[in-house]
């Protein structure tokens, strides 16, 4: 596609857009499943909007990270293995499988450099409050903002890598 009239940057952005549209559809199905499973208690929760936004931003992080990995790995079996190792590793380090209050402080300090840590921090904060205090709301917005920054960094890395690969 390097001989195409469409610029490389536009091709990359359209690929990202396609991925986000497909991911958004799957996210919508997942949210509908959660609403069906929990009935009126979940959408009736005061924190429902925060939960929805948190999952949406985390989906953007996951999709952009997977796209970035896909730029480097061309074998689908290797891609699947790397994705499993990364996702399970982040889940173990960031408190998805093991509660954060049980984890060592040093592990938690390291996990702050991973997006799943902030996703879990927001979820734990939302789970602790039926009505968010001002401090809790600041903590939630900080976590969601950091997740969004991870997604933006990954997208910028995708654009830089694709540009480098096409110039090479």
Describe each region flagged by the PLM.
Residues 27-49, 57, 71-76, 96-102, ...:
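Short helix-loop junctions at transmembrane helix boundaries
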Residues 50-76, 91-94, 149-158:
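Hydrophobic alpha-helical transmembrane segments of polytopic membrane proteins
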Residues 127-130, 144-168:
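Junction motif at the cytosolic side of a transmembrane helix
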């Amino acid at each position: 596609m390097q001989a195409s009239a469409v610029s490389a940057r536009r091709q990359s952005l359209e690929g990202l857009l396609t991925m986000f549209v497909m991911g958004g559809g799957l996210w919508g199905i997942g949210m509908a499943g959660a609403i069906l499973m929990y009935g009126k208690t979940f959408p009736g929760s005061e924190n429902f909007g925060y939960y929805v936004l948190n999952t949406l931003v985390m989906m953007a992080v996951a999709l952009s990270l997977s796209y970035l990995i896909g730029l480097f790995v061309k074998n689908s079996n290797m891609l699947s293995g790397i994705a499993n190792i990364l996702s399970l590793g982040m889940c173990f380090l960031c408190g998805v499988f093991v509660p954060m209050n049980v984890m060592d402080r040093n592990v938690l300090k390291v996990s702050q450099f991973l997006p799943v840590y902030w996703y879990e921090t927001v979820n734990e904060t939302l789970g602790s409050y039926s009505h968010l205090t001002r401090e809790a709301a600041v903590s939630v917005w900080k976590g969601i903002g950091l997740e969004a920054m991870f997604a933006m960094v990954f997208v910028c890395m995708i654009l830089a890598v694709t540009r480098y690969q096409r110039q090479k």
